[in-house]
Amino acid sequence: MCTSLLVGKNATVDGSVICTQSSDCGNCDIRLEYVPAAVYQPGEMRVVKGWNVYDFLGTKGSPPVRSGPTITIPQVKQTYAYMATTFPFMNEHQVAIGEATLVGIRTELAPSENSDAKIRITDLSRIALERATTAREAINIMASLMEEHGFNAWNPNWMNLVPGGNDACGEYFAVADKDEVWCFEFLPVGSDWKKDSGEPGVCWCAMRIPDDMFAVNANESIIGEINLSDKDNFMASSNVKSLAIKHGWWDPKSGEPFRWDLAYTGKKANSLRTWRALSMVTPSQNLQPHADGYPMPIRPDKKLSILDIRKIHGDRLEGTEFDQTKGLAAGPFGSPNWPFGAPDQTRAIGTMSSDTIIINQCREWLPALIGGVMWVGLGGGDINLYVPFYAGITRLPKAYTTGVRTQFDWDSAFWVFELVGSWAQLNYVNMIKEIKAEQLRIESAELDRQAAIDEEAWKLYQEDPYLAREHLTNYCIENANEAVDSWRALANSLIAHYSFGTATTIEKFIAPEWWRKEISEKRK
């Protein structure tokens, strides 16, 4: 259950376009993958696999791959390099994608084994980044493939995403490039779709986020009214309205405008995560939780930075009535990671189930291989550390390509960050202060260096783009390795300092009085 943010270039402090994704599955792949560019011969085919959310490398000891249907499509002459985890996130032309599953769509749209629909999202988005040089092109590539071969959505019950929920879900991609960012939502078209029916195998709609606006997707549709005559800001499939009319979800004679969200989900986006993200960027609006929808996209009160975005992705509802660090479930030391099954448990943007969080930064004033930056955080947004990887790099640090979910590995970057996060649960209220201080120190230094790294890369690029790639690759590897070493040192310090509630100074961390009193009363 992911969260994705979209920010137009005039809503950021430096003119960057930003789109993000938190992979919150808790069992997705924890490694990064660099997929190089390639050239193909006429007549070659591209296998489209039915991967879901599991290990794409098939390393021994990994979770099993859950595959779906496989098809082949004609390969293109040239594919572009890109970076990925379970999902891809940016290519060498700084086309970027962030994903979130749409839950709660109409049950009649769920596909079945009788359907001819074959396309699933992991390889779909990879194909887009292999072939696209702009966001619009990426959307059209994906839409065309699904219209021809059908969108085969996975079942949220099968994935245990929504206990007691329905069997239908759709998908959302934030799709960005150096100039703009789009919200692209698409749905399956039912259990009986056939390829030879003459009907598209998907129902989709895309909305451009205005340059001075911000939006968030928290697993619910955020597209409302659409204006298909405004081709600069909207795109859609030919069945975008007819499918709703067919099922009785919208009547054009009613006088009511067509709303994508109401037609296909029956509601406007109003989750706690949606409210929290919007309220963090527009405190002046005084938005209230659980309203009947929110203005989306929205103009932020101030221009946003990378650090602002990382704060949103790490938010645990602190300072609100839903604060996860408060109350009996948080324990005496304020852990936001409540036990499963705790009453009144809320879902914050930050969560311990995050495998990776990617902040894609696209900048039009630089060549693509320099302008595109992927800020990668492994583990929960409150306890991880973001490191930059440029779009033009050709290699990755070993620590970021190592590790599986089923075995602790001190050489795996994910497990270093996960160890710090897990240990922090012993005394969160105190340890999180030390973690945040290290986050700010390292990430601020990375951002301070960015202009100098860009400038040197630009000088080398004018001489030979290969030299710029090597410069950026070496910097990213060195910086990432230093970051992991810093987090290993932090882990060593926290383990020694917070051992069974007693510090090496013999300072004891006593549970707060309110907690001791409440526990005492419950024992009576």
Model-derived features: where do they sit?
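Substrate-recognition/cap regions that form aromatic- and gly/pro-loop-enriched pockets
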Residues: 333-462
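Second-shell loop/turn segments in exported
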Residues: 111-114, 124-132
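A contiguous strand-loop segment
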Residues: 2-121, 141-303
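Accessory, solvent-exposed terminal regions and/or long lumenal/extracellular loops of proteins
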Residues: 265, 274, 279-343, 347-351, ...
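Histidine-centered catalytic/metal-binding microenvironments
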Residues: 443-524
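A short catalytic or substrate-binding loop motif that flags glycine-/basic-rich loops and adjacent residues
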Residues: 1, 165-167, 349-355
